[in-house]
């Protein structure tokens, strides 16, 4: 069991149960999955770009991503149907907690001019999204070996019913929120 998973079971559950008045332990919100998505529009012109994106996402997540393809052709963007356009990976369980630990403790503090993450990126149902502009904030990516700076979207899905519950959960995991 990872460090954050033990911390969640021992401390966070009791704190959230007391704060929100849950009667049952199963009512306490938890993180169900983390989805990492990297859209690579340059893959239309050069097919090798998608391979670099897949290798970067594999290093970051520790799991092989799925290559996402276009659903329909759009002539204005010069895209045909079933063109590889990005990659995504869904983390659950042990790998999810290990990634969350690395994100909070190592990656986010390495962002240039970092003042905390926005508290307004919740979707209304207790899920949180973070946009990362450069993949080099993760220590697994070596700056000398990348071909281009690419951003990625990190979606944290929780069982929380409201944004306040989700924010309390993520704050307990020491997410550095701005105000």
Swiss-Prot record:
GO terms in the biological process aspect are:
translation
What keywords would UniProt list here? Ribonucleoprotein, Ribosomal protein, RNA-binding, rRNA-binding, tRNA-binding
Which Gene Ontology CC terms are recorded? ribonucleoprotein complex; ribosome
- SUPFAM superfamilies the record matches: RL5-like
Gene Ontology molecular functions: rRNA binding; structural constituent of ribosome; tRNA binding
Family (UniProt): Belongs to the universal ribosomal protein uL5 family.
Q: Which NCBIfam families match?
A: PRK00010.1
Subunit composition and interactions: Part of the 50S ribosomal subunit; part of the 5S rRNA/L5/L18/L25 subcomplex. Contacts the 5S rRNA and the P site tRNA. Forms a bridge to the 30S subunit in the 70S ribosome.
Briefly state the protein's biological role.
This is one of the proteins that bind and probably mediate the attachment of the 5S RNA into the large ribosomal subunit, where it forms part of the central protuberance. In the 70S ribosome it contacts protein S13 of the 30S subunit (bridge B1b), connecting the 2 subunits; this bridge is implicated in subunit movement. Contacts the P site tRNA; the 5S rRNA and some of its associated proteins might help stabilize positioning of ribosome-bound tRNAs.
| Record protein name field | Large ribosomal subunit protein uL5
Q: Which organism is it from?
A: Bordetella pertussis (strain Tohama I / ATCC BAA-589 / NCTC 13251)
The primary gene name is rplE
């Amino acid at each position: 069991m990872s460090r954050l998973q033990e911390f969640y079971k021992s401390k966070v559950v009791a704190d959230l149960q007391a704060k929100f008045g849950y009667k049952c332990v199963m009512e306490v919100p938890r993180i169900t999955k983390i989805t990492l998505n990297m859209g690579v529009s340059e893959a239309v012109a050069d097919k090798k770009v998608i391979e670099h994106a897949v290798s970067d996402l594999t290093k970051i997540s520790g799991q092989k991503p799925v290559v996402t393809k276009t659903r329909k052709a759009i002539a204005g963007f010069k895209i045909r149907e079933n063109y590889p356009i990005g990659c995504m990976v869904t983390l659950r369980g042990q790998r999810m907690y290990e990634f969350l630990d690395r994100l909070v403790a190592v990656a986010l503090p390495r962002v240039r001019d970092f003042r905390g993450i926005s508290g307004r990126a919740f979707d209304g149902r207790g899920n949180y999204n973070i946009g990362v502009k450069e993949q080099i904030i993760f220590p697994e990516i070596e700056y000398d070996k990348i071909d281009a700076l690419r951003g990625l979207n990190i979606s944290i899905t929780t069982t929380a019913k409201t944004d306040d519950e989700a924010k309390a959960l993520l704050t307990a995991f020491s997410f550095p929120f701005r105000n």
